[in-house]
Amino acid sequence: SVRILNYVTQNGVRLTFPVTSAVIENSIIFGGNAEELELGQDTTSSADYNVLITNTLIKGKKLETPNFVDCHWAKSQNIRNASDTVFVNTNIDNIAETGYFNFRLDSLSHARNLGSVSVSTLYPLDLDGKDRNADGNPDLGAYER
């Protein structure tokens, strides 16, 4: 889950603080909750709130704000349905047989070929050292398929 807020409430008092720059690119925001992303801006204060999310697969209700550019929203909101995932293995029920979670993209993943080439040029290698730009269509997330 990801929460980006420019406020917090402590002891019944709302405190605001600036979010001067929060940028998420070529990423996957996915998990076991129906809503995996929360953006919150205190509109009663003048605290900065500069959030940009681009070329990202998000599990949650589609939000229509300028904060999102070329984002893709997960089709299903079923909390426990493992087929909603875009990864090879995130099913905790079969850990003994399958090994631990595998966050590499599944062959049918919705996150394949959706990345921005300009972003992947800045970060050309995935966590395995694989070239994200080899096929000209970078994938979202930490691993290139």
Predicted regions and their residues:
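Predominantly extracellular beta-rich ligand-binding scaffolds that present long acidic/polar faces
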Residues: 1-103
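C-terminal accessory segments
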Residues: 77-145
